[in-house]
Every structure is written in C-alpha cells, then in structure tokens.
C-alpha cells in the first residue's frame, strides 16, 4: 500500500435491489432514490475486498451525503489512501461517490486497521 492508491467500483441499484434491502429491515425509500446505507455499503466492499483488502478492520467512517442517488443511476464509488501510520497499522482513506455525470453523491473519510502497512509509504 502506498499514499494515493485508489480503488473503485461502478454500480447501479435497481428497484429490486432496493426492495430486497427493505425486506432486510431497511427504511422504505420514497420509491425513486437509493437508501444511503446501500451506497455506504459500496465503501465497505471496497475496503474489505480491494483496498486495503482482506483482513481490514473498519474502525471509523464519516459520510456527508450531498444529493440523493436515483434508482438505476450509475454510481462510481472510490476509496483512496490519504495517510499511512505504520507504527499503529492504520490507514486513512478518502471515500467518494459520484454519478456518471460527475455529480457528487457523498464524500467522507474512513479509518482502518490493516495487517500489512507499507512502512516506506508512511
């Protein structure tokens, strides 16, 4: 891992996806937008599977949603390493979700504990 490393996922949520979320106990949406926790889950996926990846322990997250995401709207969620603290095995990341038009859906930060922090990157 190095400062500036980045991972992204492209995804859209259908009405069926939202209905399945509501069945799990989520809040019923207004019928047109994607519930914010579904978008936040994209960051959990990226952190646990891609960057830093398996073995990551999610410690903290803050998100600011700036506009709603419409169902079926194509979203691009990304995480980028902004700080490495190898002495504590911690990594700080920027989290960002935009639509295909480049409009910001949400922005935030994440703090994770990782197995192998590159000492040279800190």
Where are these regions (language model features)?
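Hot-dog-fold acyl-thioester-processing enzymes
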Residues: 1-56, 60, 119-122
């Amino acid at each position: 891992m190095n400062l500036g490393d980045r991972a992204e996922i492209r995804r859209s949520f259908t009405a069926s996806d939202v209905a399945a979320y509501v069945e799990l106990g989520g809040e019923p949406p207004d019928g047109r937008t994607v519930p914010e926790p579904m978008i936040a889950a994209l960051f959990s996926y990226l952190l646990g599977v891609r960057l830093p990846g398996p073995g990551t322990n999610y410690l903290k997250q803050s998100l600011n949603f700036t506009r709603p995401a419409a169902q079926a709207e194509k979203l691009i969620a990304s995480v980028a390493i902004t700080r490495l603290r190898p002495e504590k095995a911690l990594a700080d990341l920027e989290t960002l979700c935009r639509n295909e038009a480049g409009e910001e859906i949400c922005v935030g930060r994440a703090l994770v504990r990782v197995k192998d922090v590159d000492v040279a990157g800190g």
